[in-house]
């Protein structure tokens, strides 16, 4: 009761002209509201822990029978390659879509040598060109297939962190064309078949850059924020048709895009990351505030929960820290470029 007395005294000091009885009622109300707030945050955190470490996701087989197909864009390297290999291991035939034909052939051979019963098809297309003829080829390829899973992995970031005013028009256009138009056009070709079959899974690779305003990666950050909103809206539209839509929120992963080679607790390799994604379909992980989204890798999930539920994504402090980190990365990249330029000139 000492706690309640202090709140009653506080209300008196605020000079709200409340009668003593109403001061007590108000104090009880504030205490109850605060307790509910703390309890709700605690329950949310428990849900996050259960989602990340205990509860399984949906079975991949619920999206299509044996002999059905998975389409993976940006398939030849990094996450795309790993998605292709792990989905093939799960028994899905694979359509590999990426820019470089030779890499697609190499990956196709690797898949069929490891999994003899799995079929593959390949399509070399440059999403940056946004050519109608390429999408017509993709449509002709998938229309004859039972596509159960689409992995929208194709993407591009800035070569190095760069202020928006200094970003080249070519890089800016490529990022928007590949990340946004490429994802939308590929999805629009495949969704009708899934709707007809009343099942399917659409995974789109998101980024913490879409959660956090990211200075020096402004165009990339904006493209991922767009995908966040688009994927959430699409998930609501397609849910009644039996199609699961999920945007995967990811922090850094060892890859050519991130230019990070050494894995750590917070930066997994593609194999570990993809395994977590495919084993946690339908679970929000560390993203309970975002419908049709997930942060399934354990450390990414904990970071996403902290940033979205505790720190807040739009706070000036968080944005400032994010800017400082990318300014440091830019300085190191520019120094490295100067050293390489000096070596070539000698």
Swiss-Prot record:
SUPFAM superfamilies: NAD(P)-binding Rossmann-fold domains (SSF51735). Its EC number is 1.1.1.330. Pfam families: adh_short. It is found in: Endoplasmic reticulum membrane. InterPro entries: 3_ketoreductase_fungal (IPR027533), NAD(P)-bd_dom_sf (IPR036291), Sc_DH/Rdtase_CS (IPR020904), SDR_fam (IPR002347). GO terms for molecular function: ketoreductase activity; very-long-chain 3-oxoacyl-CoA reductase activity. One of its GO terms (biological process) is sphingolipid biosynthetic process. GO terms for cellular component: endoplasmic reticulum membrane. NADP(+) binds at residues 71, 126, 134, 153, 220, 224, 253, 255. It comes from the Eukaryota. CDD domains: 17beta-HSD1_like_SDR_c. Pathway: Lipid metabolism; fatty acid biosynthesis. The chain crosses the membrane at residues 26-46. Keywords: Endoplasmic reticulum, Fatty acid biosynthesis, Fatty acid metabolism, Lipid biosynthesis, Lipid metabolism, Membrane, NADP, Oxidoreductase, Transmembrane, Transmembrane helix. Component of the microsomal membrane bound fatty acid elongation system, which produces the 26-carbon very long-chain fatty acids (VLCFA) from palmitate. Catalyzes the reduction of the 3-ketoacyl-CoA intermediate that is formed in each cycle of fatty acid elongation. VLCFAs serve as precursors for ceramide and sphingolipids. Belongs to the short-chain dehydrogenases/reductases (SDR) family. This is Very-long-chain 3-oxoacyl-CoA reductase. It comes from Aspergillus oryzae (strain ATCC 42149 / RIB 40) (Yellow koji mold).
């Amino acid at each position: 009761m000492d706690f309640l007395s202090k709140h009653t005294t506080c209300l008196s000091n605020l000079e709200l002209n409340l009668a003593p009885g109403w001061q007590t009622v108000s104090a009880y109300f504030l205490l109850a509201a605060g307790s509910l707030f703390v309890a709700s945050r605690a329950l949310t955190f428990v849900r996050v822990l259960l989602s990340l470490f205990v509860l399984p996701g949906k079975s991949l087989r619920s999206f299509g029978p044996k002999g059905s197909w998975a389409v993976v864009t940006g398939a030849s390297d990094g996450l795309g390659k790993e998605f292709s290999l792990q989905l093939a291991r799960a028994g899905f035939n694979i359509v590999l879509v990426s820019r470089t034909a030779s890499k697609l052939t190499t990956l196709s051979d690797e898949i069929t040598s490891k999994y003899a019963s799995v079929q593959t098809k390949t399509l070399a297309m440059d999403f940056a060109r946004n050519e109608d003829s390429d999408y017509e080829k993709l449509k002709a390829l998938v229309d004859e297939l039972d596509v159960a899973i689409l992995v929208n992995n194709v993407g591009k970031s800035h070569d190095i962190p760069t202020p928006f005013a200094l970003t080249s028009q070519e890089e800016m256009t490529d990022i928007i064309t590949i990340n946004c138009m490429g994802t939308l056009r590929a999805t629009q070709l495949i969704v009708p078949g899934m709707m007809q079959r009343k099942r399917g899974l659409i995974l789109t690779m998101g980024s913490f850059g879409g959660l956090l305003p990211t200075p020096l990666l402004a165009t990339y950050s904006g493209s991922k924020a767009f995908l966040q909103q688009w994927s959430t809206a699409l998930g609501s539209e397609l849910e009644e048709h039996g199609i699961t839509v999920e945007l995967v929120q990811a922090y850094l992963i060892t890859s050519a895009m991130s230019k990070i080679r050494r894995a750590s607790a917070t930066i997994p390799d593609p194999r570990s990351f993809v395994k977590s994604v495919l084993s946690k379909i339908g679970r929000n992980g560390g993203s309970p505030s975002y419908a049709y989204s997930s942060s399934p890798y354990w450390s990414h999930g904990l970071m996403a929960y902290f940033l979205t539920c505790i720190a807040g994504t739009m706070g000036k402090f968080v944005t400032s820290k994010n800017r400082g980190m990318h300014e440091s990365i830019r300085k190191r990249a520019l120094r490295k470029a100067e050293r390489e330029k000096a070596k070539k000139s000698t």
